């Protein structure tokens, strides 16, 4: 019997091992095929880009010739003798060509016409690395020549050393050398290949540089916003550098995060970023911010990079990159007939800030010659005393007295926790949605690790349906109706209120937290999550 059991166990182990190996082999083959398809696709995409470039180039030349024909015809309109030497067919063709003028669709070459002169203008002049694709996160690290000190090596060590072996396989760091002096570029590449040979050979690190023909003439730029000529040139070139880097990185991963060459990072930064993005997978965000400084730590979904690059190309000479990003959000969601607060609420759903910051700026000497910048992110070392969620755009208000600037508005958008002086009966916290929302669940958490006793007590959760008079409700739900039309759907227990919303009450116009009895303690609200129903 023991022998038989042992034989059965051996057979089971063999079958399991065989199936596992078969599955792994099939998975590996599938992965290799996917990588091969991706390479073929990107090669085809590059051939199409070159073909488009040549077509536009020929189109530009033909338009120039047609314009010359039009001028010639205009100049000879009063002279029949000038056209006597042309055949009837030629005259007919000239008439057709000069009378028809097709509409031209603007594209990148409209804003940067110099790119048509060289089909290699959008191809890196230097490209080092394996060309890894299919990762979760692509990190873009632009660097330029600094007269005093370079921080690039320290930055890369900080980014690499805080990755686990598994994380190193799920990302790629693209170093963009924004210089056209090939001697300088090659020196930087040689230095990086020596210092980070393992990372480059494994595909984790890539190094690129743009061709000189990528840049337009930057000598006659209009001075704006009180900036000097040199600063305008610096910020204009910086915009172009960001665009080239983003275009190169777009096809490599799911997300693209913009970094700089003079930063340090926190431990576990990669998993924190990835998990935060996955938590927001069902939300319609455009920018996730992991630092409050400039363009550092701004993450985008790869499909959105096309819009961002196009927008920057349109206005690259006008404003710095962080201002242009804010304008994109304004164009997408702000109503000119509404006030600034309404606009900020709408933008906060597209631009979501993670705290505390994961990246700290350490460079003292700017890439702009002679500029000293003592910029540091004050949120870098702060402990996280609140939780971040994306909530429906809403106007928030409260009767409670706010303590030391810990406002309800900041809490609702995930920037801070709300802290108020002792609540009394009749006090309220109100969330009035900009438009009615179908709500699935809610969560309100009071207190925090530093002040665990500052919780909401004797407080109820109430909702106001949008179609209050037309509701078809069960008797149980009807009994929850209050005199002012709100429905009491929950209450705080041990500082927490959470639950679901009866679907028959949807859509909801407002959420309200109502204090029923005087409290003996102050109140902190450190987490607000009003979860919309998914379609």
UniProtKB/Swiss-Prot annotation:
Cytoplasmic side: 1-6
Pathway membership: Protein modification; protein glycosylation
Keywords: Coiled coil, Glycoprotein, Glycosyltransferase, Golgi apparatus, Membrane, Metal-binding, Secreted, Signal-anchor, Transferase, Transmembrane, Transmembrane helix
Gene Ontology BP annotations: glyoxylate metabolic process; N-glycan processing; protein N-linked glycosylation
Activity regulation field: Inhibited by UDP.
Role according to the record: Glycosyltransferase that catalyze the transfer of GlcNAc from UDP-GlcNAc to the GlcNAcbeta1-2Manalpha1-3 arm of the core structure of N-linked glycans through a beta1-4 linkage and participates in the production of tri- and tetra-antennary N-linked sugar chains. Involved in glucose transport by mediating SLC2A2/GLUT2 glycosylation, thereby controlling cell-surface expression of SLC2A2 in pancreatic beta cells.
Post-translational modification: N-glycosylated.
Entry's transmembrane regions: 7-27
Highest taxon of source: Eukaryota
EC primary class: transferase
Named cofactor requirement(s): a divalent metal cation
Coiled coil regions, renumbered to chain: 28-54
Family: Belongs to the glycosyltransferase 54 family.
Enzyme Commission identifier(s): 2.4.1.145
Lumenal side: 28-535
Compartments where located: Golgi apparatus membrane
Membrane topology label: Single-pass type II membrane protein
A GO cellular component annotation in the UniProt record: Golgi stack
Catalyzed reactions per annotation: N(4)-{beta-D-GlcNAc-(1->2)-alpha-D-Man-(1->3)-[beta-D-GlcNAc-(1->2)-alpha-D-Man-(1->6)]-beta-D-Man-(1->4)-beta-D-GlcNAc-(1->4)-beta-D-GlcNAc}-L-asparaginyl-[protein] + UDP-N-acetyl-alpha-D-glucosamine = N(4)-{beta-D-GlcNAc-(1->2)-[beta-D-GlcNAc-(1->4)]-alpha-D-Man-(1->3)-[beta-D-GlcNAc-(1->2)-alpha-D-Man-(1->6)]-beta-D-Man-(1->4)-beta-D-GlcNAc-(1->4)-beta-D-GlcNAc}-L-asparaginyl-[protein] + UDP + H(+); an N(4)-{beta-D-GlcNAc-(1->2)-alpha-D-Man-(1->3)-[alpha-D-Man-(1->6)]-beta-D-Man-(1->4)-beta-D-GlcNAc-(1->4)-beta-D-GlcNAc}-L-asparaginyl-[protein] + UDP-N-acetyl-alpha-D-glucosamine = an N(4)-{beta-D-GlcNAc-(1->2)-[beta-D-GlcNAc-(1->4)]-alpha-D-Man-(1->3)-[alpha-D-Man-(1->6)]-beta-D-Man-(1->4)-beta-D-GlcNAc-(1->4)-beta-D-GlcNAc}-L-asparaginyl-[protein] + UDP + H(+); an N(4)-{beta-D-GlcNAc-(1->2)-alpha-D-Man-(1->3)-[beta-D-GlcNAc-(1->2)-[beta-D-GlcNAc-(1->6)]-alpha-D-Man-(1->6)]-beta-D-Man-(1->4)-beta-D-GlcNAc-(1->4)-beta-D-GlcNAc}-L-asparaginyl-[protein] + UDP-N-acetyl-alpha-D-glucosamine = an N(4)-{beta-D-GlcNAc-(1->2)-[beta-D-GlcNAc-(1->4)]-alpha-D-Man-(1->3)-[beta-D-GlcNAc-(1->2)-[beta-D-GlcNAc-(1->6)]-alpha-D-Man-(1->6)]-beta-D-Man-(1->4)-beta-D-GlcNAc-(1->4)-beta-D-GlcNAc}-L-asparaginyl-[protein] + UDP + H(+); an N(4)-{beta-D-GlcNAc-(1->2)-alpha-D-Man-(1->3)-[beta-D-GlcNAc-(1->2)-alpha-D-Man-(1->6)]-beta-D-Man-(1->4)-beta-D-GlcNAc-(1->4)-[alpha-L-Fuc-(1->6)]-beta-D-GlcNAc}-L-asparaginyl-[protein] + UDP-N-acetyl-alpha-D-glucosamine = N(4)-{beta-D-GlcNAc-(1->2)-[beta-D-GlcNAc-(1->4)]-alpha-D-Man-(1->3)-[beta-D-GlcNAc-(1->2)-alpha-D-Man-(1->6)]-beta-D-Man-(1->4)-beta-D-GlcNAc-(1->4)-[alpha-L-Fuc-(1->6)]-beta-D-GlcNAc}-asparaginyl-[protein] + UDP + H(+)
Glycan attachment sites: 77, 85, 458
Name the UniProt record assigns to this protein: Alpha-1,3-mannosyl-glycoprotein 4-beta-N-acetylglucosaminyltransferase A
Molecular function terms from GO: acetylglucosaminyltransferase activity; alanine-glyoxylate transaminase activity; alpha-1,3-mannosylglycoprotein 4-beta-N-acetylglucosaminyltransferase activity; metal ion binding; protein homodimerization activity
Species: Gallus gallus
């Amino acid at each position: 019997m023991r022998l038989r059991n042992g034989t059965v166990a051996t057979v089971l182990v063999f079958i399991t091992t065989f199936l596992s190996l078969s599955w792994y082999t099939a998975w590996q083959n599938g992965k290799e095929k996917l990588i091969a398809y991706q390479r073929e696709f990107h090669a085809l995409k590059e051939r199409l880009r070159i073909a488009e470039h040549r077509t536009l180039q020929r189109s530009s030349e033909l338009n120039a010739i047609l314009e010359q024909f039009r001028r010639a015809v205009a100049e000879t309109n009063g002279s029949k003798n000038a056209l006597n030497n042309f055949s009837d067919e030629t005259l007919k063709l000239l008439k057709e060509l000069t009378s028809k003028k097709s509409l031209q669709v603007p594209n990148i070459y409209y804003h940067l016409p110099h790119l048509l002169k060289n089909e290699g203008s959008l191809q890196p002049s230097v490209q080092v690395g394996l060309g890894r694709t299919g990762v979760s996160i692509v990190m873009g690290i632009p660097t330029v020549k600094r007269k005093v000190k370079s921080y690039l090596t320290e930055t890369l060590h900080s980014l690499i050393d805080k990755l686990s072996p598994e994380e190193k396989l799920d990302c790629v760091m693209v170093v963009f050398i924004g210089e056209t002096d090939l001697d300088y570029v090659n020196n930087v590449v040689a230095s990086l290949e020596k210092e980070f040979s393992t990372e480059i050979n494994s595909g984790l690190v890539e190094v690129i540089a743009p061709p000189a023909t990528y840049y337009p003439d930057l000598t006659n730029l209009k001075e704006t916003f009180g900036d000097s000529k040199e600063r305008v040139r610096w910020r204009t070139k910086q915009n172009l550098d960001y665009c080239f880097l983003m275009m190169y990185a777009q096809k490599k991963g799911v997300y693209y995060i913009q970094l700089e060459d003079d930063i340090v990072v926190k431990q576990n930064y990669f998993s924190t970023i990835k998990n935060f993005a996955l938590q927001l997978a069902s939300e319609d965000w455009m920018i996730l911010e992991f630092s409050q400084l400039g363009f550092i730590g701004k993450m985008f979904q790869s499909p959105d990079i096309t819009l961002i690059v196009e927008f920057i190309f349109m206005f690259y000479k006008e404003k710095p990159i962080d201002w242009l990003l804010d304008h994109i959000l304004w164009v997408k969601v702000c109503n000119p007939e509404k006030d600034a607060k309404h606009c900020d609420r709408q933008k906060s759903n597209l631009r979501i800030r993670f705290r505390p910051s994961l990246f700290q700026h350490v460079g003292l000497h700017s890439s702009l010659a002679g500029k000293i910048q003592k910029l540091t992110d004050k949120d870098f070392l702060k402990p996280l005393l609140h939780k971040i969620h994306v909530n429906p755009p809403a106007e928030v208000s409260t009767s409670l007295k706010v303590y030391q600037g810990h406002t309800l508005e900041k809490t609702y958008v995930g920037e801070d926790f709300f802290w108020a002086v002792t609540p009394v009966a009749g006090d309220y916290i109100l969330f009035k949605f900009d438009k009615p929302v179908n709500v699935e669940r809610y969560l309100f958490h009071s207190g925090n690790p530093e002040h665990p006793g500052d919780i909401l007590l004797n407080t109820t959760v109430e909702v106001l349906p949008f179609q209050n008079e037309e509701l078809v409700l069960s008797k149980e739900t009807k009994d929850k109706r209050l005199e002012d039309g709100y429905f009491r759907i929950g209450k705080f227990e041990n500082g927490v209120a959470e639950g679901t919303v009866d679907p028959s009450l949807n859509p909801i116009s407002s959420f309200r937290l109502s204090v029923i009895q005087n409290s003996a303690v102050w109140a902190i609200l450190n987490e607000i999550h009003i979860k919309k129903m998914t379609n």
